[in-house]
Amino acid sequence: MIRPLINGFSLTFKHLFRRPITVDYPNQKVPMFPRYRGKQVLMRDENGLEKCVACGLCSVACPADAIYLEAAENDGTVMAGPRYAAVYQIHKTRCIFCGFCEEACPVSAIFMGKDYELAVYSKDDFVWDKNELLVPATTAPATQEGRETR
């Protein structure tokens, strides 16, 4: 009866003077592991144009059917290829963050980023379109999110 009580107190006193395990979350953020799969990001090439060629392989590879894509003919201002994604949407309520879209992309246009703050106030905000997924044009492709391009 007294033995378990002593064991419990010894464990408590052992951890009492160690540094805390918890993190003050809004002020401090824990760095993500290299293989962490967060919010998807659409990449740009070295000229600042979109990399997506609208092949639709990401949409086909998605087991949750979370990616919707509409292709359109390109005039050379959006990207270098003949087609581009006129509509590109990812439904976050369906996405299971498996990374199959990243693996299926032949031109490395989409990858899983490190962003994990995905909370929104409205259900409609869970559908992210191309403008919300595209990397800003000023960021160099090789240094985006610390990831190398293929």
Where in the sequence are the language-model features?
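Non-ligating segments of multi-cofactor redox enzymes
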Residues: 1-103, 107-150
